[in-house]
Swiss-Prot record:
InterPro entries: Bcl-2-like_sf, BID. Induces caspases and apoptosis. Counters the protective effect of BCL2. It comes from Sus scrofa. Intact BH3 motif is required by BIK, BID, BAK, BAD and BAX for their pro-apoptotic activity and for their interaction with anti-apoptotic members of the Bcl-2 family. SUPFAM superfamilies: Bcl-2 inhibitors of programmed cell death (SSF56854). Its main location: cytoplasm. The gene is BID. GO terms for biological process: apoptotic mitochondrial changes; hepatocyte apoptotic process; positive regulation of extrinsic apoptotic signaling pathway; positive regulation of intrinsic apoptotic signaling pathway; positive regulation of release of cytochrome c from mitochondria. It is found in: Cytoplasm; Mitochondrion membrane; Mitochondrion outer membrane. This is BH3-interacting domain death agonist.
């Protein structure tokens, strides 16, 4: 675990969150937004290897190091996909507690083009605060918030598939601002 102090999420953190939310949404086999999700998948930044990086001695990175880095990255991506599938199954069980009126209201906020990204995050946070208290505390508040955040994204995308891109990015930003430490620890504990 990297212990350096940071005031925000790094590209690596954003990549992890993108993979997690994308994997969560992919785990919904009967969703009406699969076409939009496929398009979004092509727009997401992909991990690039350091195959053309020069080393301090002026030589190119060796294949052994490149293969190890790619293997680590692939391993991490597999872990994140597994976590996403697991959280999606939990979300399936939690779905009962989300009233359609909350989803309608949240979808209306995402359709409102005059709202800023911050306004959308605040709207998402307000809905989450309404929901989080209606679930048992045995799962832990951070895990409950993470699942509910992604579940709300899925519900809004099912309600209005055209909103998928906006709700995806707001969800990623919300997680990076509010649940990043929990997410880092979750991924790290699964990697160990």
């Amino acid at each position: 675990m990297d212990s350096k102090v940071s005031n925000g999420s790094s590209l690596q953190d954003e990549r992890i969150t993108n993979l997690l939310v994308f994997g969560f949404l992919q785990s919904c086999p009967h969703a009406s937004f699969h076409k939009e999700l496929e398009v979004l998948g092509h727009e997401l930044p992909v991990h690039t290897s350091g195959s053309d990086e020069l080393q301090t001695d002026g030589n190119r990175c060796s294949y052994f190091m490149e293969d190890a880095a790619e293997t680590d990255s692939e391993s991490q991506e597999a872990v994140i996909r597994d976590i996403a599938r697991h959280l999606a199954r939990i979300g399936d069980r939690m779905e009962y507690g989300i009233r359609p009126g909350l989803v309608d209201s949240l979808a209306a906020q995402f359709r409102n083009q005059s709202l800023s990204e911050e306004d959308r995050r605040q709207g998402l946070a307000a809905v989450l605060q309404q929901l989080v208290h209606s679930y048992p505390a045995d799962m832990g508040q951070e895990k409950t918030l993470l699942v509910l955040t992604m579940l709300l994204a899925r519900k809004v995308a099912e309600h209005s598939p055209a909103l998928l891109r906006d709700v995806f990015h707001t969800t990623v930003n919300f997680i990076n601002q509010n649940l990043l430490t929990y997410l880092r620890n979750l991924v790290q504990s699964e990697m160990d």
